[in-house]
Amino acid sequence: MSGNTFGKLFTVTTFGESHGLALGAIIDGCPPGIELSEEDLQLDLDRRKPGTSRYTTQRKEADQVKILSGVFEGKTTGTPIGLLIENTDQRSKDYGKIKDQFRPAHADYTYMQKYGIRDYRGGGRSSARETAMRVAAGAVAKKVLANLWGIKIRGYLSQLGPIKAELLDWNEVEQNPFFCPDKSKVPEMEAYMQALNKEGNSVGAKITVVAENMIPGLGEPVFDRIDADLAHALMGINAVKGVEIGAGFACVAQKGTEHRDEITPEGFKSNQAGGVLGGISTGQDLIASLALKPTSSLRIPGQSVDIEGNPVEVITTGRHDPCVGIRATPIAEAMMALVILDHALRNRGQNGHVQSGVPIIPGSIPGQIGS
């Protein structure tokens, strides 16, 4: 398995399985002198961890992160940062009945075909449990971006099943278990999830992430465009089946006069492009959305085959998220942070001396609301 490292200058390598002893990460390329503590990382880990509400998996993991190296007297040293989170609430017996079966729409079948062996306990390495280390590493990246460039990254749930939520109030996002920015939609989401739990079914979701106070010039055309790398990062999250930058697929129905982001000396008049032109950041908010499929670990029987190719009926009795998108917001934020920091360091290395002489256009016209 060779796909466990992300980034070029700011790199993150993760290891560990869902029911193994621990999860870990090695971060390399972190600038020195940044104040960093375990508490800084724990804030985002607590936002992601399981068992925090009745609408997520009831697996109880403290997700207490330990910084093993790379930090001295409260500051990064520039050497590799080692991170570790112990698994404490594995219940592998839940998976005994399906160890020789392939759960529909899971990685069971493909892992077995590729490697000839798989850890069936909770999905092993393919489990979303692995994303705890992405969130921890992303918290480091967030801290560096805020300190060196003033960039802030945050996200929200923009759709749960058929229920759409507009970005009305950032302050509401952390006040409910859904990361929903529209307070009026929360009761509807609660009722929907309660009905879903009774049914034993699951549903998908859409998450939107935004990087504010962006700087222009990040992105390496032609193959390492910042939007291409961002799409790569977000598609690498478990259960993600689609990514949009800015207007995304809605641009198909737009006319050129609607989609073009006109520029004035006072600022950009809109942000249909999502803060990227030609694969390079414009300095506007960098905006991406991702679609997450419904989990197929269900109490409702489903058809599949066993390792010998015989037909079987699969029922999954483990502890699973009825909507994996509910806990995906901090994961998406983390992946966006990793991409932006990697590109910021690459840009500083090659183009840090460049002075274009072109005035920096504000991200939007002062007082303008909307896209």
Curated annotation (Swiss-Prot):
Residues engaged in binding FMN: R125, S126, S127, N238, A239, G278, K293, P294, T295, S296, S297, R319
Cofactor note: Reduced FMN (FMNH(2)).
GO BP, one annotated term: amino acid biosynthetic process
Residues that, per the record, bind NADP(+): R48, R54
GO molecular function: chorismate synthase activity; FMN binding
Disulphide-bonded residues: none
Tagged with keyword Zinc: no
UniProtKB keywords: Amino-acid biosynthesis, Aromatic amino acid biosynthesis, FAD, Flavoprotein, FMN, Lyase, NADP
Pathway: Metabolic intermediate biosynthesis; chorismate biosynthesis; chorismate from D-erythrose 4-phosphate and phosphoenolpyruvate: step 7/7
GO cellular component: cytosol
Keyword Kinase: no
PROSITE patterns the record matches: CHORISMATE_SYNTHASE_1 (PS00787), CHORISMATE_SYNTHASE_2 (PS00788), CHORISMATE_SYNTHASE_3 (PS00789)
Cofactor list: FMNH2
One of the Pfam families matching this protein, by short name: Chorismate_synt
EC code: 4.2.3.5
Broad enzyme group: lyase
Catalytic activity: 5-O-(1-carboxyvinyl)-3-phosphoshikimate = chorismate + phosphate
Domain of life: Bacteria
PANTHER family reported for this sequence: CHORISMATE SYNTHASE (PTHR21085:SF0)
Function: This reaction introduces a second double bond into the aromatic ring system.
Subunit relationships: Homotetramer.
Protein family according to the UniProt entry: Belongs to the chorismate synthase family.
HAMAP family for the chain: Chorismate_synth (MF_00300)
Protein name: Chorismate synthase
Organism: Saccharophagus degradans (strain 2-40 / ATCC 43961 / DSM 17024)
Upper taxonomic lineage: Bacteria, Pseudomonadati, Pseudomonadota, Gammaproteobacteria, Cellvibrionales
Gene this protein is translated from: aroC
